[in-house]
Amino acid sequence: MNNKRTFFQYVIPSVLSFALSGVYAIVDGFFVGNSIGDAGLSAINIAYPITAVLQSVGTGIGMGGSVKYSILKAAGNEKKAREFVAGATWLMLLFSAVLTVTVFFTSEKILSALGASGELLTLGNEYIKVIALGAILQVFGTGLVPFMRNYGGSLWAMIAMICGFATNVALDYTFVWVLGRGMYGAALATIIGQGVTMAVALVYCAIKKNLTLKIAPVDTPKTAFQILKIGLAPFGLTLAPNISLVIINRFSVYYGGQEAIATYACISYIICIVYLLLQGVGDGSQPLMSQFCGAGEEKSLKQTKTLAYEFSMVLAVISAILIYLLRGKIGLLFGSSAEVNAGVIKVMPIFLVAVPFDAITRVSTAAFYATEKSVLSYVLTFIEPIIMLVLMLMLPPVFGGQITIWWSAVFAKVITASVSIVLSVRYSAQRNR
């Protein structure tokens, strides 16, 4: 098998799919920002982590189930592999129901905890109520895509995402600009777009005859535990930019106010697309790494990891250069004020420093959960926000204000990447013994 050709057949569609998933948030920000202004943009920025939780739950469950599916199938245990498809489907149904009820009835309290108040709270609550009602569409829209990739359907996974994205854009234009439905319209466009992705994914899985709910009751708890054990890392990795968003927003409220929040809203919309591109490399190569792990093909596994690191670094550098050159247009894209746009021009280069380091971390994390090294993937996933929080508590009072909030986020990524290199080298040495 030509590993390089196969690698890109899996990874390119995955990268494009993740890019589109990042653009979902940008679409809402673009239409709302140009319709309502800085207040609407800030409200979307504060509320979006809740949406991200729903999507990350789907990604985590889907990735956990699909990793086990690929490893077991490669080892020749087709029957057991299908049980993990069923287990993941039941988990997505369960979590969808729980999240719908929880988010809908506690949305105002959650938004307040995220730093929203006054007009931002009102606008954010209008957005999240609708998102909560469409939780099942978000969870399944993101949760079925990893299975499509592991069934060999990376291209169809991309097509599903494109269909959802196109629907989202068309409906955002219609609901927000033409009909003037504001936050409500943006949220409705988002969940319908995810619903279209879910529909395409369901049809594909049904055609492949890999859509099943059949699992022995006695095996259900163990299967669910194994799915969640692996899925916790991709859940956290998908959510990580939004955890950072929450932390940065909370400190920015104190040090920089609404202008700083709006500035980071513009930055985060763009920078998160880059992070998702890099995650697309890791998750796109996951089916191959899981298959090679299950089949005991160590040489092919190593080659796949190397290709993933190289390709993610190339993407990181190219993306950082392009964003730096175009940074003066970013604030204007979202209809921000002149002050906010000036802030974006000044602050964006700081965040671009961290992009190559994030490339290392995301591929390392994906490699760990693809080969069932869950604990190591947890370390890389959750150490970054912890380091960031500690730095933001320590540095601003000593060195001064909002600028150290920005740099704390960068330092956290540099430290996490350093840890990922150490863990990856040690893990590779253990496998080669």
Positions of predicted regions on the chain:
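Small-residue-rich hydrophobic transmembrane alpha-helices
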Residues: 41-101, 138-157, 263-325, 358-372, ...
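Helix-terminus/linker motif at the lipid-water interface of multi-pass membrane proteins
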Residues: 23-42, 111-118, 174-181, 242-269, ...
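Transmembrane alpha-helix boundary and packing residues in multipass membrane permease domains
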Residues: 14, 18, 30, 34, ...
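Short runs within selected transmembrane alpha-helices of multi-pass transporters and secretion channels
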Residues: 62, 131-149, 157-168, 186-201, ...
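N-terminal transmembrane alpha-helices
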Residues: 2-36, 49-64, 68, 93-100, ...
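Transmembrane helical elements of multi-pass membrane transporters/channels
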Residues: 9-28, 130, 141, 164, ...
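Short alpha-helical transmembrane segments in multi-pass integral membrane proteins
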Residues: 1-14, 69-136, 178-232, 289-354, ...
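Alpha-helical transmembrane segments of multipass membrane proteins
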Residues: 26-30, 101, 143-147, 169-174, ...
